[in-house]
């Protein structure tokens, strides 16, 4: 399966609690932190919920 790199580009401060929990669940902490995750529907749904806070790149 393909992998994606998720980078936190905006702060979750002042956002809804569900969005902050999603950021933590993805393993993102400080700004500009990145994680590499498998490209599956569960992860893509989480990324879609906080798409205004993160950038996503495909990893080869």
UniProtKB/Swiss-Prot annotation:
GO terms for molecular function: structural constituent of ribosome. Keywords: Ribonucleoprotein, Ribosomal protein. The keyword Isomerase does not apply. InterPro entries: Ribo_uL30_ferredoxin-like_sf, Ribosomal_uL30_bac-type, Ribosomal_uL30_CS, Ribosomal_uL30_ferredoxin-like. One of its GO terms (biological process) is translation. Disulfide bonds: none annotated. One of its GO terms (cellular component) is cytosolic large ribosomal subunit. It comes from the Bacteria. Belongs to the universal ribosomal protein uL30 family. Part of the 50S ribosomal subunit. This is Large ribosomal subunit protein uL30. The lineage of its organism: Bacteria, Bacillati, Bacillota, Bacilli, Lactobacillales.
């Amino acid at each position: 399966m393909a992998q994606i790199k998720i980078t936190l580009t905006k702060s979750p401060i002042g956002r809804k609690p569900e969005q902050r929990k999603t950021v933590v669940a993805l393993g993102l902490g400080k700004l500009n932190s990145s994680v590499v995750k498998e490209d599956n529907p569960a992860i893509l749904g989480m990324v879609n919920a906080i798409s205004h806070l993160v950038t996503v790149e495909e990893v080869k």
